[in-house]
Structure formats: C-alpha cells, structure tokens
C-alpha cells in the first residue's frame, strides 16, 4: 500500500506505548522523518511549529525506540508502537493526552473549553 501524504507533505502519526498500549502522542512525519525513523529505529518527526526535523528525545533523552509501524486502511495515517525511554509529553507527563473534556460542558464544535 502507498503512503498518502497531505498537501503539505505530512502524514499524522499516532504514537502508542508497545507495552501498556497507552496512546502517547500525535505527531507528523514527512518523507525525511519517516526515512530517518526507519534507518535509525528511533522516532523522528516533522515539527510544524519549528518547520524542521525533530528527533524525539534528542535533547531530553526521552527517545522512542520503534517496535513497529502500521499504515491505516486509507494509507493516510500511521500507528507507531514504541518503547519510550521517558515521558512523551513536553510537560513531563507520560502521555500528551491528559486534558479531559466534559461532555456536559461541551457547547458544540465552536466552543472554546479554555
């Protein structure tokens, strides 16, 4: 199956802990990041804010050793299972997903929960 990148040349990557199955983060890869990930066995992404390649954990030491990569049924998203060497989130939390949304307080798609 062929990888389908978006107009900006990116593909979303859901990163999951291979042991606990917890979803750790959502990031994006371009072709170069995917190539580096496959070559090194460690997670590399494209930073949309900095507009540069990003080796996860290069400065913090919280690298992610890749166990496997799976392409979704449409070819436009990746699941990357990893063995993390530390927290995935820049806040120091294990996962970037730690902000629950209360459905009772949700007012619709234009509601800003801040």
Each model region followed by its residue ranges:
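C-terminal binding/interaction regions
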Residues: 2-10, 16-24, 29-114
